[in-house]
């Protein structure tokens, strides 16, 4: 099994490279490859333990998404985010349940609602994987990422209540509402507490490697602590991620932030790649258990369910955008109707993934319609990832909603850079009359004045100054290359520790220059 895991990772790396080369979301070839491998004779069957999948994959990926989220933008878009994360989940679950009950009358209502809850939430991992290389409007990205952080909680609460109701034979909507409210509040509180405790741990550890390890463990701690008291582990992880993301500049050293980014990027790539591959690998076992069914009927059922899933999101998206503003003049004035293009993009960006698969496989043995539900979950993941995932980019470009490419840093980035440079200049100027630091301050003032002038020129877009600043930065890159080449040629003359230190300094300086040029993310 270990050899198979290494082989899957190698294949994921190849597919990710090909996906970038052919400009397709890399989640798509991963799922397709997993489905193809599922029918390769002689390969060992890969068991997908659903509880392990939720516990292993969700906490770090959700924590990282929350950590990177623009929290002020998240708060300013909280209304549409909640309308999608809660309202769209409930509406979609209801539509899918009605369609499933209509097409499969023998399916109990509880099982049909469980199916709806399984398929309702667009997946955070899938959304991030598909949107990563696209450039939709920032407002669209904020709402979609915010939705994907919270919708798993609402869908899992509805799913658990529906499963329990099916087993017990009764369904209580009041219990569902109470469970959702309690789970959300409890999860948020536990995530906040774990985040605060984690910050105390970081201060006590004061070591880069230990801090990074503790930051990874914090998400798992929040998830398991919340699940232990039947609160929402998803909300707990998101709350913990928000807390750490907001406080990272106070609790982490510069070295910790730089090295943590590399570690988290690696973790994200490995977990994201494996989860999509594992989703595809589940197809073989499901097909074997469905041999007794009429495949024409199953195909029509899968098609109808997937269409209901996609159409219901369009209906809900345009309904919540149009009806409340039609009824409230204050809302229209405070929050004008978003462009139809934005609504179309958000409606089409409803890819399903790990949560839907894990929830379907977590259904108890003997659950009514379990095999059909698992089959429909795989079909929905396949359709939304392959159809919507591959066409989302062309749709965004066709609607003309691609953020324009900017030669160099974005204006808002340069505004922040100017403020930082101005603050640094003021701090140095304050030391000009200091007997202890005056001479050194005189030397630094001119350097920081040049940085401020350069930032102002780039922010205002004045072409001559902008081009001159860019030429200076590129010349500095050439100088760094010459310095690095000298180190390589004379590496036998230098102590290994000194060589390593100088190389790190040159690498950091190069990264800073490339960021100023806008050449790195």
Q: For each of these PLM feature ranges, what is it?
A:
Residues 404-521:
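Cytosolic C-terminal regulatory domains/tails of membrane transporters and channels
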